[in-house]
């Protein structure tokens, strides 16, 4: 997504179970897409009636069922900072005054809370996992008042109440990254990012979401990727991880990677 148009490409295998080697992108024109849209706030909510897109613009929320036709959702008000949409049918809304969850586009709100400080308010990435057979969501992102040396994941089991996974042990935490991206992939947690803005040069892994280490082998970024200086977004469509660089007016690139153990013999 850009401010001017959306672009799409196939990411599913064809009838021969082959994935596209080249990304053939097509343009989708918008109708009523909001000015000053905060592109990093875009989320996709899965629900009983399919999927729906939401984005924040000037502290208001706008939605679309197809990515092309957009409308303003007045019930959310005009104090929205960010959105999280990882639980089916539940949209978590972060405002100037706190956090709440809604199942009906803001008509009814379940007031939530976060334990501690420095809850993410922008560039939020989320991932789903299970703990004791219960669905959970983990997020990372930027906080306007964060003075911590760590990238701290936050976890929720309902979208309303959030707990930080702080690490007090020496040298086994994920350092503070400029634009961290979290994912649960191949039965491990990963955080991608860099200490520098608009760079992607490190992957950290964890088995519990608390203790982290930098990957040294098997799961690494290509050297050419680490030399790119541009904003990026990352999407997991297992078994693939897609990294999209762009948005700075000069650099546009798409990379795709995977763990070999997750690839079937037919796909490889």
Give the ranges of each region predicted by the language model.
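Entry beta-strands of beta-propeller and related beta-repeat scaffolds
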Residues: 49-55, 89-92, 133-139, 187-192, ...
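Structural signature of eukaryotic scaffold interfaces centered on beta-propeller domains
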Residues: 41-49, 83-86, 125-133, 181-185, ...
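Loop/turn-rich, solvent-exposed surfaces of beta-rich toroidal or solenoidal domains
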Residues: 174-181, 190-201
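Short glycine/acidic-enriched loop and turn motifs that connect beta-strands
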Residues: 1, 61, 98-99, 142-148, ...
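Trp- and S/T/G-rich repeat-edge/linker motifs of beta-rich repeat architectures
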Residues: 1-40, 62-79, 101-123, 155-176, ...
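Short, solvent-exposed loop/turn segments that connect beta-strands within catalytic domains
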Residues: 15-21, 47-51, 87-89, 130-135, ...
């Amino acid at each position: 997504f850009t401010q001017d148009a959306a672009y799409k490409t196939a990411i599913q295998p064809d009838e021969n179970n082959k994935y596209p080697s080249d990304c053939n992108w097509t343009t989708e024109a918008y109708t009523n897409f909001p000015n000053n849209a905060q592109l990093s706030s875009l989320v996709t909510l899965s629900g009983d009636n399919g999927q729906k897109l939401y984005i924040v613009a000037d502290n208001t929320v706008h939605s679309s069922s197809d990515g092309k036709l957009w409308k303003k959702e007045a019930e959310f008000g005009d104090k929205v900072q960010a959105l999280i949409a990882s639980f089916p049918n539940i949209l978590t809304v972060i405002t100037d005054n706190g956090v709440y969850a809604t199942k009906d586009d803001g008509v009814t709100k379940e007031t939530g809370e976060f334990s501690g400080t420095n809850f993410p308010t922008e560039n939020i990435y989320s991932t789903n996992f299970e703990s004791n057979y219960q669905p959970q969501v983990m997020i990372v992102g930027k906080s306007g008042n964060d003075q911590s040396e760590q990238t701290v994941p936050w976890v929720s089991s309902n979208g309303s109440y959030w707990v930080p996974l702080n690490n007090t042990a020496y040298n086994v935490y994920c350092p503070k990254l400029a634009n961290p991206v979290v994912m649960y992939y191949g039965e491990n947690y990963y955080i991608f990012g860099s200490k520098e803005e608009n760079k992607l040069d490190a992957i950290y892994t964890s088995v519990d979401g608390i203790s982290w280490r930098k990957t040294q082998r098997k799961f690494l970024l290509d050297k050419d990727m680490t030399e790119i200086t541009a904003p990026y977004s990352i999407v997991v469509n297992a078994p693939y991880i897609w990294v999209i660089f762009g948005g700075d007016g000069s650099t546009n690139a798409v990379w795709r990677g995977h763990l070999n153990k997750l690839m079937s013999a037919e796909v490889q």
